[in-house]
């Protein structure tokens, strides 16, 4: 669930940045206000900071987890997870945090990640979406589109509801089905639902 929420949020941010570039000329001609990539990035940073202020709400053990500032503080772990590109964890850590020898190990990151509830990413998605939602209407109506898509994630045989063992030489994988709601006028995701692939 956390992987999905992070993927949806990252997809939303990336898509918004691309769409902003492609429609900016049209929006300027129409006299509309347009959110630029810097504004979108600031909105995401602000949403993460707001979560950090109440990080105990998103901790597996409130009062114990995320109380000290460690090598992987809460406010860095969230954007780090959003920035994953599919490499090994060690490479992801080096890419995101640089070659600083004081950066924590992959084991330390895994421990830190386990202290953050999956609901943190769901909350971030909704808070971020609300912060960029200008409630624009088209002829008095809000135009929404809903579409579904499958997302293959790492194989986990312990989750039989989404596990596919693979056949004909194909690797095993787990499958999630994502239904996302998109505002066609504002070009933002406003909601999403994750379901097991079976």
What are these language model-derived features?
Residues 3-198:
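Conserved, well-structured functional cores that handle cations and Mg-NTP chemistry
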């Amino acid at each position: 669930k956390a992987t999905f929420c992070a993927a949806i949020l990252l997809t939303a941010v990336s898509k918004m940045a691309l769409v902003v570039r492609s429609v900016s000329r049209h929006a300027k001609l129409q006299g509309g206000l347009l959110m630029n990539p810097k504004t979108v990035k600031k909105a995401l940073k602000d949403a993460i900071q707001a979560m950090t202020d109440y990080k105990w709400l998103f901790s597996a053990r409130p009062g114990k987890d995320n109380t000290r500032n460690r090598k992987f503080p809460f406010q860095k772990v969230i954007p780090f997870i959003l920035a994953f590109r599919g490499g090994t964890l060690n490479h992801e850590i080096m890419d995101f945090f640089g070659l600083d020898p004081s950066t924590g190990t992959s084991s330390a990151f895994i421990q830190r990640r386990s202290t953050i509830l999956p609901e943190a990413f769901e909350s971030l998605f909704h808070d971020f979406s609300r912060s960029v939602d200008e409630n624009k209407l088209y002829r008095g109506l809000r135009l929404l589109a809903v579409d579904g898509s499958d997302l293959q994630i790492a194989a986990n045989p312990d989750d039989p509801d989404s596990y596919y063992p693979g056949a004909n030489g194909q690797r095993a994988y787990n499958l999630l089905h994502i239904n996302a709601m998109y505002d066609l006028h504002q070009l933002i995701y406003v909601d999403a639902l994750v379901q097991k692939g079976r």
